[in-house]
Each structure stands twice: as structure tokens, then as C-alpha cells.
């Protein structure tokens, strides 16, 4: 048995002493603040006619607002420090406020630190008084020079030795040194803060100017449009039969260049992103008809089909991205408690427009022709181009079933000479059918452009996930806490591992280790091992599946512990628990652990702290289920059923989406799924309960099924390179070391180190690692009771330790597995254990 080398924990401070400590600091702040105000009032109302140490006066009426004592105090300060006497009370007030701001920290007296602070104050006062004497003339109202007696003696001595310029330089250096030591001021932080404030002011002025300029241009455009439309409306009462219809625009002439003669049953030419279908226009007898149909339709089409000028513009960056544009002045700016800058990621490329409205209209015409060849009458209603695919929304003719169009997906892909075509049978809120055709030149979605959006910056959840862009190029941001678990599946090369890395980096760029912690299980030993050493990890990256089973078992135990803690606190979820703890800390109160069991009357329960959200990431849980067996499926089901309110979430990824891996038990408890490209429609139905994933393009193209809906959303996943992951990991390593919980993996040896897929005896190892295992077996054999609570009461140990002992006995053949009613039977013969 290994000897424990843990140092004994310090005795907790009694609650009454903590409360007294807080109140004394508050009282000291009030007293020193009142003293500083009194001194300042005395200095501001100083009068030479009042009595003082530097002169004599016999007046009966004191002019000083602070009274006779204030007159003496002001005279002493002016006599010693001169003009610097005005600064002295301010220094005391600033230092007192700094001490009060740390009132919740335990009091730790350090004589060495107090000496340094006193030395800093002395240097600050002496150098300030000397500078005042050198550069200011003494007025008649002061008893001595502008720097007082101290400033006069030091200033004259330094001026004789170093001249005025040398003396000024020396005293400025001493003043800054004293200010830094006394107030603990970092000039590097001051420079960084000054730069950020300057940048914010510049952005504010620039934004105001941009908004004014855009409003001015919009006003001019509206005025020009009104002037253009005014003659038309005035001429409307004229005889319409004598006027020619208005000349169509260049865009309409291009779209109608190859249009066949209008027939009542023929499909209409697609008008890009227009309103619902209207009957074909035969003639325009009224003079006003062309303007009433063309102009509003062009205005409505602009938000749907993105013109090249609008698509080339980058999305508006978030406030965080704008602030982080300023490069850090010093390498050591990565301090603990800050988040890495988004600028360490690769910037997004300038996207070029590879299409035109004419080319999109041509593809729409070809789509109508090909469907007509297969006996399906449709009309293209609107076109929605995106970075990777373009969606053509078609309106089927009366009597055409959507299933006929869906069955023609492969035939359309062959006819259009593209990789694949996906048919969207139902578009929420529309009567059209979507046909998604890949673009000839695919654009890459960079991870940095998704993180730099205001949608990601405005999310408050510590487990916010940035997935990528939808088919229209808009960012897709979701919250893992609302899922609350995620199932990811896709074949090799579909972008599944890159998608998992993007989710992990989304958490790392959003949360500190106090807000979110990670447990990573990597059977491949390559995908997640790169994150080894970041402070968010609760344990080292798990690569052994025996350790993985114990990590899940610890997660279940932690879930149960949090539920008991929240029930004792009277809250319903982790957010309410953390809010209650923070409110108590701000009020200067301490909430003790209600579940703490005292071993003696002198024991004080520890103070509660906020609990972080825990995310368990499994890169390939198919391999884990093959090695460990059905036990892992039960643990995953328990976590998925109950862990949402406890703040524990699962991200399960696999490249083998078969029914023996993604079982019905797992699917029933994890409704949020994400399907990358798969090889068959059966695999697609296994993941998202419908087809479509087999028609994806790969390389990050996915179907994301949000919680609470059965309609998947097509998302183009953001690309994360290995260099970006390395830079992010190194940035977090500079901010702190990981604080591992040894109970997560050490329990594997106690719970059954001979876990070989489904059997194996771990009895010898358990007896060697746990000194009480033999006593537990002897108690079970003698009492014939295989109860965890009985072993816990008999040996006076914790519940988790007793449960591991019972599980070890089950593996060794001492007791039977748990029956349907939760009980076990002792099958080994009675008597002491050999």
C-alpha cells in the first residue's frame, strides 16, 4: 500500500472571526476616509492668520473650516511638504480603498511587504516635495517654500549636484518608483489600458461618422427616388392606351433573353427571391403597371440573393474582436484569468464572388428542364446562393408529390454534372421544395470569422459552440447547455474530428477554468492528446478505455453529489447554485457545505464555491463500447438522463454509425445530433432518423438537428487547422497549469483493474490497492449481505469507495450482479476469505 504524502489541510477559520475581519476592514475604510476628508478640508481652508506651529497668532475666531486642530494639522503639512500636502490625503485614501477591495481575502500579515509599502510612500513624498520646490515658486500663503522643509532641503542639495534637469529626472524616477511600490501599480497595464481606451474612442467616433454618412446617403437616395417617381404618378390619369409600357430593366432583359412564349401552363422564369407566385403577366395596358411590379420586387429580392458587392464584405466584427485588434505591448500580457485573443487564429480570406444573377438563373432554367424530362412540372421560385451550396426553391405543379422529386436526387446530380444533390422536402413556413446544388468553387469557412461575430460574443453560456455557417453564410452559434448532450457521427474524412476540435476551441475561447472543465477520452491517442496540459482538464487525456469507464463512473458520482448539494441549497440547476454562491460572496457571507460530515465537534464545514460546467468529450465511443461493454452504455444513459441540471454534458463522436454503437437507449436520451457525410441512407437514418447525410459533400458539411425539432439544418463547419489548436493550447498553458482530480483515474485500480471487456479477476489488485478490501469481503461473507450501505456503515467509509468494493467483489465472483430490484446475492461460501 502506498503511503499518502498529502499535506494536512489548514484548519478552517471560524465563521465569527471571518465576519469580524470583514467588519473591521469596513470600519477602517470609513474611519480613514473620514480622516482624509477632514485633512483635505483643513488644507483647502488654510489661512495664515490662524494659529499654527510656524507662526503665532492671537485671534479668537479661527477661519479654518476644520477648526483649531485642523489649522494646526494644515500648518504642519504645508510646513513639511508644501504643495504636496494636497496629494498626501489622496494617497492614503487610495491605499485604503485597495485594502478594502480585498476584504474577502484572508488576512495575511507580511512584515516584508509592509516595509516595502512604507519605503514606497517615503520615496513618493520626498520626491514629490522636491519636485514642487524646484519647479514652483512659493506663494505668500505657505509657511515655507513650495516643497516645504523636506522639499527645500532635498531640492537645493540635488540642484547643486545635478543641476535642474538632472534633479528633475532623478526625482521623477523616484516618484514613479515610489508610486509603483506603494500602490502596486503596473505601468505596463496602464499603457495597455490607455491603448484600449484610445481604440474604443476611435471606434466610437468612427462608428458615429459611418452611421451619419450612411444615413445621409440613404436620405439622398430616397429623395432621388421620389423625384424620379413623381412624374410617373402625375401622368397616371392620362390615356393609358396611347402610352407604351415602361422599358424593362437590364436585369429583366437578361433573365427574359431565352424565355419561351408565355403559355398559361408553362413554368415562369425564376425571379430571384421574390414574393409568392403570381399569375404570368400578359400585357400591361396601364401605364403604371411596369413600375408597380418591377420596383417593389427588386427591393424585396435584395435581402435574399446577395449581390457580389454585398457578399464580398466581411461580416461586422464583434466588440471583442475589435478590442483584440490592438496587439499586446508585451509578451507577458497573457495573465491568469484572461481569455486568449481571437487574433491568434488564422484570419479569414477575402471571399471572391464566383457567380452572377445570370448564371444562377441559367442553372434554374436547366433544373426546370431536367425535371420536366423526368415528368415533373416545377417552377423555380427563388435562389439562395451560399459559400458552399446554392439552394433553389421550386414550386411543384398541382398534383406533384414531393417524394417523386426526392427520388430523383441521384438522377439530377448526374444530369447537372455535380457531386450530389440534396432535396429538402419541407422548408418551414414555405410551400416550396428546396434543391441544394454544390457550388463550382467552394469557399472555406474559417473558425476565426465565426468567433469574431457578435452572435458568439453576446452568448453568456460558458459552453457556447461555434459550428460554422449555414447555407446563406450566416454564423451558426448554439449552446451546449440547452442541448444538453450532443451525438456526432460521420465517416472517415467527413470533417468530424475538425468539428469536435472547433467545439472544444469554442469553449476555450469563451470560458475560464473556473467556468468550464473538460474530461477528454481519446481512444485513437492522436485527436485529443494535443490538449494535454491545458488548465481546463479535470484529468489527463484518457487513452486507456479501462480509465475511460472509471471517468464516466466518476461523472455519475459527481452528478449525484451535485444533485444532493442543490437539493440541500434549495436551487433547481447549476446556474441557480452559482448565482446563490456569488450573491453570498458579494454580501461578505460564507455558505458552508451542508453535506459535510464532521468527524469531531471542532470541525468546521468547508465553504462552498461556484461549480464549473463539466463537458465529457469522447472522440470514438464505438471503440470504448467494444472494449468496456454494455456498462458504458448504461453510464452514458444515466448521465444523459439526469446530468443537465447538474451542469455535466456529453459530446459523443463516432465514425461507425451503426445500430450496435448508436443504440436506441443512447438515441432516446440524446435528441441533439450532428451528422457528417455517411456512406448510406441507413447510416443517415441511424443518426438523424431520416436520409440526407449520404448526400453531403464532406470536409465539414453537416446536418445539425437542434433540440426540440426534427428538421435538420445544413451547416458548413468551420475549419480549424492543427497550428491553430497548438497556438490555443500554448496560450492557455501560459495562463496556468492544470489542477487534476486524482480520484477520476485512481479509482480504476480500486474498482477493477482487470477489466478486460467483460470479465477477468481484479481481486488481487484490489486487495493490494485498498487496505479495507479484505475486511469488506469478510464482512459480506459472514453477514451474507452484499449491500453498499452496509459495507459503508461497517467500515465507516464513503459511498463511492464502498460501491467500488462491491463491484470488485462482483468481478471476482463473490457476489452476483445487481438484480432487477437492486439487490445482490452472496454466492461465495461462508467463512473468512483466504
Curated annotation (Swiss-Prot):
CDD domains: TrwB_TraG_TraD_VirD4. GO terms for biological process: cell division; chromosome segregation. Residues 473-685 form the FtsK domain. InterPro entries: FtsK/SpoIIIE/SftA, FtsK_4TM, FtsK_alpha, FtsK_dom, Ftsk_gamma, P-loop_NTPase, WH-like_DNA-bd_sf, WH_DNA-bd_sf. One of its GO terms (molecular function) is ATP binding. The chain crosses the membrane at residues 26-46, 73-93, 118-138, 168-188. It is found in: Cell inner membrane. Residues 189-834 are cytoplasmic. It is a multi-pass membrane protein. ATP binds at residues 493-498. The keyword Calcium does not apply. Residues 240-272 have a biased composition (Basic and acidic residues). GO terms for cellular component: plasma membrane. Keywords: ATP-binding, Cell cycle, Cell division, Cell inner membrane, Cell membrane, Chromosome partition, DNA-binding, Membrane, Nucleotide-binding, Transmembrane, Transmembrane helix. This is DNA translocase FtsK. It comes from Pseudomonas putida (strain ATCC 47054 / DSM 6125 / CFBP 8728 / NCIMB 11950 / KT2440). The gene is ftsK.
